[in-house]
Regions:
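Extended, helix-rich architectural segments
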Residues: 1-253, 307, 323, 351, ...
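Residue-level "hotspot" positions that anchor or transmit function at local structural transition points
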Residues: 236, 256-258, 263, 325-326, ...
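Sequence/fold signature of self-assembling virion shell proteins
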Residues: 217-222, 228-230, 242-244, 251-254, ...
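C-terminal anchoring/interaction modules
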Residues: 1-52, 122, 130, 139-140, ...
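Generic detector of bulky aromatic hydrophobic side chains
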Residues: 104, 158, 264, 529-532
Length: 606
């Protein structure tokens, strides 16, 4: 812990920061209440927030739950991957290496699980947060990137903004065991007690005890130093500073992270003004879900009343009511001459008209339409549609809302990758080993450091020093896991190209002209392959001309063999107009041309 007397950040600064934290907490009370209530809806506990009789049935239907898990499956079907594109020719090799190394870093962080958790959180509450940190304890002290899901309840920012990077201060909080804190910071013994800040809590299924835990606060803030924005960081508990970058200026001259951004990335589902968190599917459809459940309750109550007949028994009627109500009794005892139609009578009930069931079904359809969770998106079909291609097309068309949401997720993923690159630039000074996937799926073992990401000297222009250049990359995000429909369409397109002869080197020019007017995934790769095939064909034809010309000059019999081999290889000779040209009755025109070319090569002055 820093020397408190000479520290820039001390108890006074911590008290001011805590007051700012309280102000930020007050500004997001409504958001916290919404998140806690949404979690109860997701757990099918909506009746805890709805009115109803004590004895009334309380069915909790899962239509809203089904919507969320359906949207989540769409998000995971389009799990993203990043491809780094250089902005300068000199950075091409570094971009290719980053494109191979970063997926390994994400995999080591179990990013797919984190992406899934943040997607669920975003779909439920309208927003989610990634935390992108440098964890110096990883790899036995070597350190590495750590990516975590952050809960809005534990994060505090300036109210009224829509970009978290514009917040003056930022606080991330977490309850940590007192025993663990005292082991890590021995100077805290006897100083840990009840925190002055209380956090909103979910309605957990388990009993969560935080009596032996203390609230640890990570405080991030910006300062301008010589006209440059610098990110500073302070960790404290109660009024005790555990760490502060401003207290160690020699070690942290550029602040906590060189990129000077808050290490948090926020994504929104349906944006709303004045908040970094938007609206989720529970916010949109919870009222409809409540009405569906109320109608279900009334329908079930009516069904139960009609399914179990009740009787009115006149006072004084000599009927054994217990035997009458017990269906296992074959005999019911009554007084002689005491039973008639007036003694006992069934209570007449009225069945529920079908209009109410239709209203309930209409509400269900309303929810499906408003959330874009139609039956066809989950594999269902409308009557009369049986063709597989038609079903696949309908499923693809019904997923446009999910594709729009995935685009928002990709924007956040791009920011996460960008922060990862900046952390690699700052901390990967020591080379480390990676197993990457090379061309054709082969495994390669490479050594990588940040040497190619550091500022580089530029070549002088007319003797003028141009200073340093920082390698910068554009990040292209694509779906790593495409849906079955997308894969099928892509494969069918490739087969169509093959059947149409696009990969035939003789048709390279026509194929390239056609592809320039098309738009599909990996178009540039296909065009590059076709162009290479055409170039190889031209080179092969030139070599054939030279070989046949030389053979005709020194060994005419062998020249004819070369001509036949060229014809049998499936590659037509350039001057041959028909595959049935005669070569025995006279000199083949191709041989004639080959001889002329060979002679011109051997004797340029001829």
């Amino acid at each position: 812990m820093e020397n408190i007397q000479n520290a820039v950040i001390g108890e006074k600064e911590i008290s001011k920061a805590t007051e700012i934290l309280r102000k930020y907490k007050q500004g997001k009370l409504n958001l916290e209440q919404k998140i806690i209530s949404n979690e109860e809806f997701f757990k099918l506990r909506q009746w805890d927030h709805m009115t109803g009789g004590e004895s009334d049935p309380k069915p909790a239907s899962a239509w809203l739950f089904n919507c969320i898990i359906s949207k989540h499956s769409d998000a995971m079907d389009s799990f993203p991957e990043a491809n780094m594109l250089p902005r300068a020719e000199d950075d091409k090799a570094e971009a290719e290496m980053l494109s191979s190394v970063l997926p390994v870093v994400l995999e080591q962080n179990d990013f797919e699980t984190t992406y899934s958790d943040v997607a669920y959180y975003t779909l439920k509450n309208g927003g989610g947060v990634y935390g992108v940190f440098w964890d110096g304890s990883k790899h036995n002290g070597l350190g590495d990137i750590s990516i975590k899901k952050i809960d809005f309840i534990n994060l505090f920012w300036e109210s009224g903004i829509t970009d978290i990077q514009r917040s003056t201060h930022l606080f991330n909080t977490e309850f940590v065991s007192n025993e663990l804190l005292e082991q890590q910071y021995p100077e805290l013994k006897g100083k840990l007690g009840q925190s002055t800040i209380t956090l909103a809590k979910y309605l957990y299924d388990d009993t969560v005890d935080i009596s032996n835990k203390s609230l640890v606060i990570d405080w991030y803030y910006h300062k301008m130093v010589n006209g440059v924005k610098v990110l500073h960081y302070c960790k404290y508990v109660n009024n005790t500073v555990l760490f502060a970058t401003e207290n160690e200026p020699e070690k942290y001259p550029n602040g906590w992270y060189d990129h000077a951004q808050y290490p948090f990335v926020v994504q929104r589902l349906f944006p709303v003004e004045g908040s970094i968190c938007g609206y989720g599917y529970i916010d949109i459809a919870r009222d409809t879900q409540e009405m569906i459940d109320h109608l279900n309750s009334s329908i079930l109550k009516n069904a139960m009343v009609n399914a179990r007949p009740r009787y009115m028994v006149k006072n004084g009627a000599a009927i054994n009511e217990e035997e009458y109500a017990d269906l296992t009794k074959d005999f019911i005892h009554v007084e002689a001459n005491s039973v008639n139609d007036d003694s006992i009578r069934a209570v007449e009930t009225t069945g529920l008209p079908s209009i109410y069931v239709s209203v309930r079904d209409g509400l269900i359809n309303e929810m499906k339409e408003c959330t874009g969770n139609r039956d066809v998106a989950n594999g269902g079909t409308t009557s009369g549609v049986t063709a597989a291609s038609a079903i696949a097309t309908m499923m693809e068309q019904s997923g446009k809302i999910s594709r729009d949401s995935n685009k928002a997720f990709y924007v956040a993923f791009r920011k996460v990758v960008n922060q990862c690159i900046e952390l690699i630039r700052q901390f990967y000074d020591i080379p480390r080993q990676f197993r990457i996937t090379g061309e054709m799926g082969t495994q390669q073992y490479v050594e990588y450091s940040n040497a190619g990401l550091k500022p580089m000297a530029q070549e002088p222009i007319m003797g003028q020093d141009m200073g340093l250049r920082l390698p910068v990359f554009d990040i292209e995000v694509t779906a790593q896991k495409a849906s079955s429909y997308t894969k099928m369409a892509q494969n069918e397109l490739a087969l169509q190209f093959y059947n149409l002869g696009f990969f035939n080197p003789q048709m390279a020019d026509q194929a390239l002209a056609c592809l320039k007017a098309m738009d599909f995934a990996h178009k540039n790769d296909v065009m590059q392959t076709i162009e290479q095939n055409g170039t190889l064909l031209q080179q092969l034809q030139q070599m054939q001309q030279i070989a046949i010309g030389l053979a005709q000059q020194y060994d005419p019999a062998f020249a004819q063999q070369l001509i036949l081999m060229a014809q049998q290889s499936g590659q037509p000779l350039p001057q041959q107009q028909s595959g049935s040209a005669e070569v025995s009755g006279g000199e083949h025109p191709y041989v004639e041309k080959a001889r002329e070319d060979a002679q011109s090569v051997a004797d340029p002055d001829r």
